[in-house]
Amino acid sequence: MSKKYEDLTFTDDFMFCKILYTNPELCKQLLELILGRKIKKIRYLTTQNTIDITSDGKGIRLDVYLEGDSKVYDIEMQTTGKSNLSKRSRYYQGMIDLNLIEKGADYSELKETFIIFVCLHDPFKHNECVYTFEKDRKSTR
C-alpha cells in the first residue's frame, strides 16, 4: 500500500529522489558531509537510471546518479535491514563501469566511482555512522 504524499519522509524513495534532484545544492552538501571533502560542482547524469545489460540478467536502478569533480556518484537510500551491501556495491560498481566506457576506449578513461548507501540501520553492526570500503592492491610474493 502506498503512502499519501503528505505522509512521505526523506527516506521514502520518491521523496529522497525528488528532494535531491530538485535541490542540487542540498545534494552537493549531503555528498560533502558524507565524504568529508568539498566538491566544486555537481551535474546530474540521469534520474533513477536503470542499467540492464541483458534481457534476462539482473539490472540495477540508481536512485541519484551524478558527476562532480570528474568522479561519478550513486546515492542510494537503504530502508530495509536486508543488506549484503558489500556485494551489492561491487555489483553496482561493475554495472556502472560497463555503462561509463565506450567500446574501444582505454580503461584509464574510467572515472573514480562512489557508491553511497544511506542506511536507516547499522548494516555491519559496529556502531559506526560511516563505513568506507576501498579497493586496495595487495602485493604479490
Residue ranges of predicted features:
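Elongated, amphipathic alpha-helical interaction scaffolds
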Residues: M1-R141
